[in-house]
Amino acid sequence: MMHENPIKRRPSRRLYVGNVPIGDGAPIAVQSMTNTETTDVDATVAQIEALAQAGADIVRVSVPTMEAAEAFKQIKQRSPVPLVTDIHFDYRIALKVAEYGADCLRINPGNIGHEDRIKAVVDAARERNIPIRIGVNGGSLEKDLQEKYGEPTAEALVESAMRHVNILYKLDFYDFKVSVKASDVFLAVESYRLLAQKIDQPLHLGITEAGGKRSGAVKSSVGLGMLLAEGIGDTLRVSLAADPVEEIKVGFDILKSLRIRARGINFIACPSCSRQEFDVINTVNALEERLEDITIPMDVSIIGCVVNGPGEALVSHVGLAGAKNKSGLYIGGARQKLRLDNQNLVDELEAQIREQVKFIEANKIDVKEING
């Protein structure tokens, strides 16, 4: 059912974004970012609530103007999860949102300004126990680094990050995390690997501007998966040109696939072939949609025939092995006398899964949620 993963997490410092622990073995936090106009308070709060419902631990909000900062004050008061404020160009906005209760300040070294401005932000953060995220991006490196390296390289991204890491160290401020994002998978991966060797701050992972719902999910899964499998990463965001809720779903799917952190059902399903005794694809799609509300981690196998069906079912919390007219049901790896009608599989299997969820909750059974 949920096998241990062999990943050894990279040691890192502990900090807190609101009440969410980051680093030092804490569960890898999944976050997204709103794409509403921040000045539209109701729309932004509604999106934050939808993200929280999907499982977001943290939500980032862009605050590009002082008007947006004033709106953030109201948003923060209504948010069900900690909020990171995304600040570019004007350090004074960071000072204002710190005053209004931001849970983390994200600044970009490439455009926030001189060291004295960074010091002002650090002083505000220190006074209110707010962590900072140094966010380096391959598309917005400092001009001198662009000239030095000619193009974004891992060395350039890490040099940019280390400049500002060292400024914070010099200011005796250690409550920060770092990201070195790029849209190219290999560039991002190499940048994070290099940075991980230099500092013990928590690392926020991401492949920036990854793409649309499908291509972005694939690119992020490959890049973040490589790093996570090496034990690198303490929080992540999957960047998609799509509904931000999809970012949370993909983020948890990545962690679930690596057995790092489980949330909801892990469906194990065959791609189907002429041996299938029922419509596997439509059955799985329907159940994924119907069972999105379940947060308990479970393995559910849905296999269309008896070649691999029984074997997968033996290591699943709930399993279905296709057979003619009625398919075999397995609970906790044990075959049941009850067989499910192939003509009504979605309803019957959903009922069985929900019964198992109730049983687990009522008996407080440990379903082995692995938090790495």
UniProtKB/Swiss-Prot annotation:
Organism ancestry: Bacteria, Pseudomonadati, Pseudomonadota, Gammaproteobacteria, Alteromonadales
Organism encoding this protein: Idiomarina loihiensis (strain ATCC BAA-735 / DSM 15497 / L2-TR)
EC id: 1.17.7.3
BP term (GO), one: terpenoid biosynthetic process
Residues that hold [4Fe-4S] cluster according to the record: 270, 273, 305, 312
Gene Ontology terms for molecular function: 4 iron, 4 sulfur cluster binding; 4-hydroxy-3-methylbut-2-en-1-yl diphosphate synthase activity (ferredoxin); 4-hydroxy-3-methylbut-2-enyl-diphosphate synthase activity (flavodoxin); iron ion binding
Reaction(s) this enzyme catalyzes, per UniProt: (2E)-4-hydroxy-3-methylbut-2-enyl diphosphate + oxidized [flavodoxin] + H2O + 2 H(+) = 2-C-methyl-D-erythritol 2,4-cyclic diphosphate + reduced [flavodoxin]
Binding note for cofactor: Binds 1 [4Fe-4S] cluster.
Name of the protein in question: 4-hydroxy-3-methylbut-2-en-1-yl diphosphate synthase (flavodoxin)
